[in-house]
Structure formats: structure tokens, C-alpha cells
Amino acid sequence: MRQILIAGNWKMNCTVEEAETFFKHFKLQKKEGVEMLICPPFTDLPLTNFFLARTSVRWGAQNVYPEEKGAFTGEISPAMLKGLGCSYVICGHSERREILGESDEFIARKVKTVKEHGMTPILCVGETAEERKNGQTEERIASEIRSALWGIDKKDVGSLVIAYEPIWAIGSGAAATAEDAEAVCAFIRETVKDIAGKKAASDIRILYGGSVKSENIADFLKEKDIDGALIGGASLKPEDFLSIYEKAGK
């Protein structure tokens, strides 16, 4: 039985002062079978560690550089993230692919180094509106998955997380329908099966991301291949994020 994962990606939001206010109003009632994760900016990780260390909530990072140390100005290593208590690291988010030009090869290195350091990569995949219109969704997503998993042992693939985030839905307010999201997530599971076998496909958790909120989370989680959500804007207010978590546990 795959555990539901409700993950918040704060992106470049929340100063330390704003994060402190968030956590002071963040009162989680743990629900069985549902895991909560918060991925704040790097600057908020020490504070996040302080507030969440004695709770069931996990925390992670939005990025990593795939080297141990060195002359990589402005970057952060997997060991540094591990030292701050991170359990997860987001890899391959479309904003980093598009704005910062991260390649499939570079993302694969991140996925590999995160796994090697005992953390769980959340691999983001998704298609543009044009690719969707042209019927290229499966081609794009299969390519991203195969590239990202090249350095991962087949026996370890099932412990990863893949987040399907259609680029056209991120921050737009227009989520994919639950049925459309399920069709793509089912394809992702089949792709994982082709790469790493039936057990990996059965074990791997697949999230949907893109304008998820408390009003639609239950619809997504009714689908058999959707195991949670990667949430942006709705994770920035404790009452909104907690509402999503509550509905995920029903």
C-alpha cells in the first residue's frame, strides 16, 4: 500500500520572518497513511528543522548541486542538505528546466546524488501546452523519465517519487482534470515498469502538481495511480495547506 504524500513547494517565497509566522500557526493533526512534506527556500531550512524536528512532518529542498564540494558559487551540496535534516529533494522542476536551462543529463546527476546521500528525489516531469495539443505528452514524459533514471539501480527505482506537473497548469489556476491526470500517471507507472520492472512500478509514488487546492485534492486522490500532490501556492498559507492534508486523509 503506497502512502499518500502531500508535498508543499514554497518556491522563492517566505522570508525567515514569514516562515516563522507560518510555523507558529501550523498545527497538524497526524492522519494515518498520509505523509506531509514542506520544501522551503534554503534560507528557511534551519528554521524548518527547528519547528518540525519533533513532528511527523518531513522537510526537503527545492534544488541541489550534484557535487560534494568545490568552486560552485551559489550552489548547495547534498551533504549540506542532509546535514539540515532534509529527507527529500525536488529535481527537474519545469521552472529550473526552462528558466535556468537545466538539461536532462544534469537532472539525472541530481537524482543519482540525492539517492546516494540517503534522501528521496522527487523527479518532476510534464509537458507544455503545445506538446499536449500536438499529442506529444507521452513522448516528452517518457524521455524525461528514462533520462533521469539512467544512473539509478533498478532495485532502487521504486523508492523514488515522480511528480507529474503539466507545465500549462502550474500556477495558472487551471488544473488538469482528475481523469486526464490519471491517464498520464498511469502511463508514468507503465514507463517505470518498462525500465525497472513490475515491483518498482507498484512501489513508486506518483504525485500530481498544478493548481492543486483543497477543493480538488479529493478528486485526484480517488484515482488509482495518483499517490499525492506537489503543491505550490496553496502550501504558503497554513490553513490552506492543512485543509488539503485533512481532505487527503479522508
Where is each model-derived feature located?
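Active-site loop-to-helix "anion-binding N-cap" substructures in soluble metabolic enzymes
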Residues: M1-K250
